[in-house]
Amino acid sequence: MKVRASVKKMCEKCRVIRRRGRVMVICSNPKHKQRQG
């Protein structure tokens, strides 16, 4: 999980979602998981 000021899609499979008011990226590749914070 990477914590970043700006989250971006890193590949075609990445999905930008909102959970509990946080913007997150979920992906089949675990290296691409990101959270805004």
Curated annotation (Swiss-Prot):
| Pfam families listed in its UniProt record | Ribosomal_L36
Assigned keywords, A-Z: Ribonucleoprotein, Ribosomal protein
The UniProt GO MF terms for this protein read: structural constituent of ribosome
Give the matching PANTHER family.
50S RIBOSOMAL PROTEIN L36, CHLOROPLASTIC, LARGE RIBOSOMAL SUBUNIT PROTEIN BL36C
- Name the Gene Ontology biological process terms: translation
Any GO CC annotation of this UniProt entry: cytoplasm
Provenance organism: Rippkaea orientalis (strain PCC 8801 / RF-1) (Cyanothece sp. (strain PCC 8801))
Q: Read off the InterPro entries from this record.
A: Ribosomal_bL36, Ribosomal_bL36_sp
Similarity field: Belongs to the bacterial ribosomal protein bL36 family.
Q: Which protein are we looking at? A: Large ribosomal subunit protein bL36
Q: Which domain of life is it from?
A: Bacteria
